[in-house]
Amino acid sequence: MGEALLSKDAVFESLAQNVAIQAVRAAHPEAVTNAKFDRGELSLVIAAEAIRAVCRTLQQAGYNFLEDVTCVDWYPSEPRFQVTYHILSHKLKERVRLEAMLESIDPSIDSITPVWPSANFYEREVWDLFGVRFHGHPSLRRIMMPDDWEGHPLRKDYPVEGYR
């Protein structure tokens, strides 16, 4: 069997020396709504309204590389959309996963392109395929689907044959 999943407080206690946990808890104590440490990976569930500030804090703490931004549609559950950020510190040789949960009505979150410009295309892909808006994005437009495409094809409620 896998490792037992710990509560947020137990994760914080067992990883008290972790740079990411120290930095985020010091700067944004209310931003972390949950934490997991599973199979050697730290995941922090962040309140959506704090994502840009938390990313900036992690960058200042030495997490210098944004690996990707992805999305999961948990339809029909609410909150429906999980936006996930994988962030790496080359110096510390550590990775942290940030997750933010968004409701199905007008799913939106702040863009992190002011922190990591490389988020540009990742956020465009999530917008194009899932319909999640990124506030403050410099050019939020389709990247994979044609400009006249209707809807967002990776949503679980998207018609299999497309809109007709």
Question: Where is each model-derived feature located?
Answer:
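Terminal low-complexity/charged segments
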Residues: 1-164
